[in-house]
Amino acid sequence: MLVLSIRIKVWQTMESEITKRIVVPELEDILYKEHKVLDKGFVRLVDYMGSDESVVQAARISYGRGTKSVSQDAALINYLMRHSHTTPFEMCEIKFHIKLPIFVARQWVRHRTANVNEYSARYSVLDHEFYIPELDHVATQSEDNAQGRGNSLSNEDAQYVTDLLKRDSDMVYETYNKFLIKGVSREISRISLTLNYYTEWYWKIDLHNLLHFLRLRSDVHAQYEIRVYAETMLEIVKKWVPLTYAAFVEYCLESQSFSKSALSVVKKLIAGEDVAREDTGIGKREWRELMDVLADK
């Protein structure tokens, strides 16, 4: 075993010395490490290709590192991001191993620009692991957003909800086990399980489409349970491509876009004019969102 261990270490050392691929030390440090998300989930980086350098190289259609400075690279990446030149960002790819509740996975796969291979409950038995929200995340239905949360319930009501969720989740797993013991096929037995049970998958995507995913899913309006995954992945992207990340924050993540009518309102307000919503043709919701942006809420 000692000889084998030495050989493995020598091979790993040789590999790191002879590789010609772009290596990001900050990512090498976290390869295969679990980043805990929710109560039992995680995000684990398993592979990546490229870096900020790859984006710049693709944009310049050149080979090698060249002689450009970091400031010039940053300026170019800012330009690409600002003007939505997406192809250079597609030259970088990243692959994650993710453990997440099934209901989160069903939202996630609406982003169809990634490669996914999921744990199959047709071939394997699912573990007795399910998601139960923290009490402060159990809330009423939002009154102005058909797919969002409103105010948090009282601790007593939230505890009642989570107790029932746990009871039902345990109960359906007991039923699942009974089916398996009876010899019922795994593909039928799994039907009894609830959407809060955990699944796992490998998820590979290019940088451009990853940023689009993260812009939508890290937004405050995204469901909390998927947002925390996006926030974890954002931190990994920050280590991977810091120049691209900075441009993304500047021009996408923390920027605002306006409709033609909203932009007209902004111009009038800057000019000191009084503007009434009824005179603009803007709906109540868009108007409220515009006023919130201008008030920096």
Swiss-Prot record:
The active site is at residue 217. Binds 4 FAD per tetramer. Each FAD binding site is formed by three monomers. Disulfide bonds: none annotated. Its EC number is 2.1.1.148. InterPro entries: Thymidylate_synthase_ThyX, Thymidylate_synthase_ThyX_sf. Coiled coil: none annotated. Pathway: Pyrimidine metabolism; dTTP biosynthesis. A motif (ThyX motif) lies at residues 110-120. GO terms for biological process: dTMP biosynthetic process; dTTP biosynthetic process; methylation. Residues 41-251 form the ThyX domain. It catalyses: dUMP + (6R)-5,10-methylene-5,6,7,8-tetrahydrofolate + NADPH + H(+) = dTMP + (6S)-5,6,7,8-tetrahydrofolate + NADP(+). Its cofactor is FAD. DUMP binds at residues 107-110, 118-122, 190, 217. Keywords: FAD, Flavoprotein, Methyltransferase, NADP, Nucleotide biosynthesis, Transferase. It is an enzyme of class 2 (transferase). It comes from the Bacteria. FAD binds at residues 87, 110-112, 118, 206-208, 212. Catalyzes the reductive methylation of 2'-deoxyuridine-5'-monophosphate (dUMP) to 2'-deoxythymidine-5'-monophosphate (dTMP) while utilizing 5,10-methylenetetrahydrofolate (mTHF) as the methyl donor, and NADPH and FADH(2) as the reductant. Homotetramer. PANTHER family: FLAVIN-DEPENDENT THYMIDYLATE SYNTHASE. This is Flavin-dependent thymidylate synthase. It comes from Ehrlichia ruminantium (strain Gardel). The lineage of its organism: Bacteria, Pseudomonadati, Pseudomonadota, Alphaproteobacteria, Rickettsiales.
